[in-house]
Amino acid sequence: MRFADVIGQDILKQRMRHGVQVGRIPHAQLILGSEGSGNMALALAYIQYILCSERSAEDSCGLCGSCKKVSALIHPDVHYTFPFPRKAGEMEQCSDVYPQWREAIKEDTYLNYEDWMQLLNAENKQGNIPTKELRNIIKNVSL
């Protein structure tokens, strides 16, 4: 996903580009917005811009190895965490449903929570991020 593919949000895209260009990328950022606002698309474009080895002042190249890996949602330096309905022995951490998540996000970066739960046949179960997944996050980001 490139910034050019993100609809609107021009001021925010410019701030993100500027931070990368001057070498001031916050160690953590929360990109939050209402459903359908395109924040997942914006986050993916930002990740790709940061990791691109051939970026221009305006956007990632979309062609280098890093861009291709980010676009395929398989870059080893990017970790995704998302809610899912826990099913004992089946789905106990995000990695158990990465293939479905990757396909769903590639198909629709504007995917909402209800549609995601429906794709996983959650029935009446709520999605959550279990303790085991939180421990994995801590392990992955520990220096």
Model-derived features: positions:
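Clamp-loader machinery-focused feature within the broader ASCE/P-loop NTPase space
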Residues: 2-143
